[in-house]
Amino acid sequence: MTMENYSMAAQFVLDGLTQQAELQLPLFLLFLGIYVVTVVGNLGMILLIAVSPLLHTPMYYFLSSLSFVDFCYSSVITPKMLVNFLGKKNTILYSECMVQLFFFVVFVVAEGYLLTAMAYDRYVAICSPLLYNAIMSSWVCSLLVLAAFFLGFLSALTHTSAMMKLSFCKSHIINHYFCDVLPLLNLSCSNTHLNELLLFIIAGFNTLVPTLAVAVSYAFILYSILHIRSSEGRSKAFGTCSSHLMAVVIFFGSITFMYFKPPSSNSLDQEKVSSVFYTTVIPMLNPLIYSLRNKDVKKALRKVLVGK
């Protein structure tokens, strides 16, 4: 059978998070709750920023874009996972699997670069406050967001194109709850050396470059904060950055655990646990992290709800 015909006819079976029948309903309810909070939190954040003039600043423009990405890549993964918790045959078509892989990579890579853009925004705000409006113009902000999505699209196109050249003839059971790169490579009966090299290069670049950029930004930020004379000013600066830094550590920590090792050295069960963090937990936490400790967001929300 040719690869073209095989690809059109193939179905995969998603192994899911666990095979224990007694855990399927509790896990369904847990992840349904997480997904509802994710959707409400991120769409609510986008709407709040859109209708509140107080939040029409570069920082919240990036936060709105981040909320959009969190909503999208959670929605690429979670609905199918919820269906599989209740289904007997957890099948996914080859074409659906490739589409899921493509959009997952687009949004997860874009998330990393948006977090980097937000770090740069904080760097300019704290280290060059007088030039902030000139540097972080609407054109620059839009360009940074577009660059994040372009790099996500380029990474997804490369991974998906390389994956579609592989044959899957050993087994159709994917030991994961969604179509990710590593489980698919482990399933293929083709030579995957090129795919593994691409994974190492692309994942390494998309993790190392943003991490270094964030680290450099925060090194300058810390230096500037330590030279602020008033304790109130230092406290305000730390408060502005702490939420973002927390999101960065959680996101890049889980990504690094997943992709900074060769596929052969990864335990797929460990990968499932790590994947849960950046596919379901992080999209839920981000709007909470950025809103609970943010006076501007709480003030805007109060104004929308009570009109004061």
Swiss-Prot record:
<feature type="topological domain" description="Cytoplasmic">
    <location>
        <begin position="47"/>
        <end position="54"/>
    </location>
</feature>
<feature type="transmembrane region" description="Helical; Name=7">
    <location>
        <begin position="272"/>
        <end position="292"/>
    </location>
</feature>
<feature type="disulfide bond">
    <location>
        <begin position="97"/>
        <end position="189"/>
    </location>
</feature>
<keyword id="KW-0552">Olfaction</keyword>
<keyword id="KW-0812">Transmembrane</keyword>
<feature type="topological domain" description="Extracellular">
    <location>
        <begin position="76"/>
        <end position="99"/>
    </location>
</feature>
<keyword id="KW-0472">Membrane</keyword>
<feature type="topological domain" description="Cytoplasmic">
    <location>
        <begin position="293"/>
        <end position="308"/>
    </location>
</feature>
<dbReference type="GO" id="GO:0007608">
    <property type="term" value="P:sensory perception of smell"/>
</dbReference>
<protein>
    <recommendedName>
        <fullName>Olfactory receptor 8D1</fullName>
    </recommendedName>
</protein>
<feature type="transmembrane region" description="Helical; Name=5">
    <location>
        <begin position="198"/>
        <end position="217"/>
    </location>
</feature>
<feature type="transmembrane region" description="Helical; Name=2">
    <location>
        <begin position="55"/>
        <end position="75"/>
    </location>
</feature>
<keyword id="KW-1003">Cell membrane</keyword>
<dbReference type="GO" id="GO:0007186">
    <property type="term" value="P:G protein-coupled receptor signaling pathway"/>
</dbReference>
<comment type="similarity">
    <text>Belongs to the G-protein coupled receptor 1 family.</text>
</comment>
<feature type="transmembrane region" description="Helical; Name=6">
    <location>
        <begin position="238"/>
        <end position="258"/>
    </location>
</feature>
<keyword id="KW-0716">Sensory transduction</keyword>
<keyword id="KW-0325">Glycoprotein</keyword>
<feature type="transmembrane region" description="Helical; Name=3">
    <location>
        <begin position="100"/>
        <end position="120"/>
    </location>
</feature>
<dbReference type="GO" id="GO:0004984">
    <property type="term" value="F:olfactory receptor activity"/>
</dbReference>
<feature type="topological domain" description="Extracellular">
    <location>
        <begin position="1"/>
        <end position="25"/>
    </location>
</feature>
<comment type="function">
    <text>Odorant receptor (Potential). May be involved in taste perception.</text>
</comment>
<dbReference type="Pfam" id="PF13853">
    <property type="entry name" value="7tm_4"/>
</dbReference>
<dbReference type="InterPro" id="IPR000725">
    <property type="entry name" value="Olfact_rcpt"/>
</dbReference>
<feature type="glycosylation site" description="N-linked (GlcNAc...) asparagine">
    <location>
        <position position="5"/>
    </location>
</feature>
<feature type="topological domain" description="Cytoplasmic">
    <location>
        <begin position="121"/>
        <end position="139"/>
    </location>
</feature>
<keyword id="KW-0807">Transducer</keyword>
<feature type="topological domain" description="Extracellular">
    <location>
        <begin position="259"/>
        <end position="271"/>
    </location>
</feature>
<dbReference type="GO" id="GO:0005549">
    <property type="term" value="F:odorant binding"/>
</dbReference>
<feature type="topological domain" description="Extracellular">
    <location>
        <begin position="161"/>
        <end position="197"/>
    </location>
</feature>
<keyword id="KW-0297">G-protein coupled receptor</keyword>
<dbReference type="InterPro" id="IPR000276">
    <property type="entry name" value="GPCR_Rhodpsn"/>
</dbReference>
<feature type="glycosylation site" description="N-linked (GlcNAc...) asparagine">
    <location>
        <position position="186"/>
    </location>
</feature>
<keyword id="KW-1015">Disulfide bond</keyword>
<feature type="topological domain" description="Cytoplasmic">
    <location>
        <begin position="218"/>
        <end position="237"/>
    </location>
</feature>
<keyword id="KW-1133">Transmembrane helix</keyword>
<dbReference type="InterPro" id="IPR017452">
    <property type="entry name" value="GPCR_Rhodpsn_7TM"/>
</dbReference>
<dbReference type="GO" id="GO:0005886">
    <property type="term" value="C:plasma membrane"/>
</dbReference>
<keyword id="KW-0675">Receptor</keyword>
<feature type="transmembrane region" description="Helical; Name=1">
    <location>
        <begin position="26"/>
        <end position="46"/>
    </location>
</feature>
<dbReference type="GO" id="GO:0004930">
    <property type="term" value="F:G protein-coupled receptor activity"/>
</dbReference>
<feature type="transmembrane region" description="Helical; Name=4">
    <location>
        <begin position="140"/>
        <end position="160"/>
    </location>
</feature>
